[in-house]
């Protein structure tokens, strides 16, 4: 099905789903959906609910403190950031995906690519899904940098998605035709498909029109038997520990008929709880934005004087 997006093989949808749920397993459900939750598990559920409801702006607002959110908006406008797109699944592939789907005759080209590579190849698709699943598991088992809990979660995620892909009707030509039509139609309704367009629109101005495309992408996965929104809405958890402004929660969610489990650290900042990883990532991003801003600013010696010319030191007596 990745053919519908980029004219490639079935691995694309499995990867899209894996990335979507890897991030999604970390998100949201509060009494007032516009306000950060005061309790760690509820904070994660609240973010997940915003994603399930295609509210990318609301998700972003719940992910970081208000003061940091404003700075991230500024960094976006200045071209130093595309957060939160960079932490969402397929964030780095979103613009190329939109560009491919918006090309003239995209539907016909993608359908021809599908017919050439996947149509009627159910056995080959199943074998490819199994092989990719096995490769992914072996890769994760030898990858350093994960905690045992993270490694176990990612392995279970890859195994579940590989199993789903083996049984999904990925090689069905009629289904692919409707999938391609849906994605091409949704992509053509997005206002921009390049870096300059995103920067000009601003963070909220970019996220809002992207939401319908994300909704269509999730609906396509659902039509192939992978309920992303169901998984997001199923997020539940328990508080394992709290030490000062740091907490650890165990989350569970249901994906393709299997219960998934993972542990996540959260940090309290300015009152509410946020994912520790998100705070660290955005802190680093803002530091880089500040450094880029400083590098682009003229030094005091280069700053123009009041008369409009470069300032020069007075002559020595």
Residue spans for each PLM region:
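Bacterial N-terminal signal peptides that target proteins for export
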Residues: 2-14
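Bacterial N-terminal signal peptides
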Residues: 14-24
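Short, low-complexity N-terminal intrinsically disordered segments enriched in polar/charged residues
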Residues: 26-53, 61, 68-74, 78-116, ...
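Compositionally biased, proline/threonine/alanine/serine-rich low-complexity intrinsically disordered stretches
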Residues: 31, 288-317
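Short, well-ordered alpha-helical segments enriched in acidic and aromatic residues
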Residues: 55-70, 189, 193-200
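Short beta-strand edge/turn micro-motifs at domain boundaries
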Residues: 102-196, 205, 248, 259-292
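Acidic, glycine-rich loop-and-strand cores that form catalytic or ligand-binding grooves
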Residues: 192-222
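A short hydrophobic beta-strand element
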Residues: 243-251
């Amino acid at each position: 099905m990745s053919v519908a997006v980029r004219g490639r093989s079935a691995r694309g949808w499995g990867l899209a789903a894996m990335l979507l749920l890897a991030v999604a397993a970390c998100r949201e459900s509060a009494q007032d959906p516009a306000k950060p939750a005061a309790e760690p598990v509820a904070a994660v559920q609240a973010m997940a609910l915003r994603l399930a409801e295609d509210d990318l702006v609301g998700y972003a607002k719940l992910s970081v403190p208000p003061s940091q959110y404003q700075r991230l908006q500024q960094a976006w406008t200045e071209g130093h950031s595309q957060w939160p797109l960079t932490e969402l699944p397929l964030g780095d592939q979103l613009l190329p995906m939109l560009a491919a789907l918006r090309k003239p005759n995209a539907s016909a080209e993608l359908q021809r690519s599908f017919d050439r590579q996947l149509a009627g190849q159910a056995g080959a698709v199943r074998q490819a899904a199994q092989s990719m699943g096995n490769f992914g598991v072996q890769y994760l088992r030898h990858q350093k940098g994960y905690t045992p809990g993270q490694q176990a979660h990612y392995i279970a995620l890859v195994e579940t998605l590989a199993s789903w892909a083996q049984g999904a009707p990925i090689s069905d030509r009629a289904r692919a035709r409707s999938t391609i039509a849906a994605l091409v139609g949704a992509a053509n309704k997005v206002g921009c498909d390049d870096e300059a367009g995103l920067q000009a629109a601003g963070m909220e101005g970019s996220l809002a029109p992207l939401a319908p495309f994300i909704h269509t992408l999730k609906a396509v996965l659902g039509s192939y038997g992978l309920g992303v929104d169901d998984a997001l809405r199923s997020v539940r958890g328990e508080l394992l520990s709290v030490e000062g402004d740091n907490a650890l929660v165990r989350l569970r969610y249901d994906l393709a008929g299997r219960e998934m489990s993972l542990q996540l650290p959260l940090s309290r900042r300015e009152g509410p709880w946020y994912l520790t990883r998100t705070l660290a990532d955005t802190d680093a991003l803002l530091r880089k934005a500040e450094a880029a801003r400083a590098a682009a600013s003229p030094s005091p010696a280069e700053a123009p004087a009041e008369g409009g010319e470069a300032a020069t030191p007075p002559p020595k007596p």
